[in-house]
C-alpha cells in the first residue's frame, strides 16, 4: 500500500514543479545555500540528496542522470568533483533546513536550505568575479 507516500503539489503543474525543483537544485549546488519557503525546502531535500549520492557514485551513467536532472554541465562537474569528495565519508544527510521566519509580503514561512559543511565563499562567488572583471575592464579602458 502506498498510503501517505504523496508529495506537495505546491499549486503548480507537473512540468512547472519539475522545472522549479531543477532550478532550485542547480542554485543550491552553485551557491551551497538558498532561502525559500518551508514546503519547497522540504520537497527539494530528497532531490538534492539523491543528486549528491549520484555524484558519489561517480560513473558515466550517474553523470548523465545528473545532467538530465539539473541541465548544467558546470554544476554537474562541481557536484561530481567538489561535493562528492566532500561527502565521501558521509552516508546521507547532506542538506540542512533551518527555519528563517516569515516573508514580509504574504507571511509565508521561510527556510534556509544549505549543505552541511558548506563552503562559505561559494555564495556570491559568481557575482564577486563579475564585479572584479568589470572593474578590471574599466581600469584597462581608462
Swiss-Prot record:
Chain coiled-coil ranges: none
What processes does the entry annotate via GO biological process terms? translation
A single Gene Ontology CC annotation of this entry is: cytosolic large ribosomal subunit
Q: Give the UniProt keywords, A-Z.
A: Ribonucleoprotein, Ribosomal protein
Q: Which domain of life is it from?
A: Bacteria
State how it assembles: Part of the 50S ribosomal subunit. Contacts protein L32.
Q: Which HAMAP family match?
A: Ribosomal_bL17 (MF_01368)
Protein name in the entry: Large ribosomal subunit protein bL17
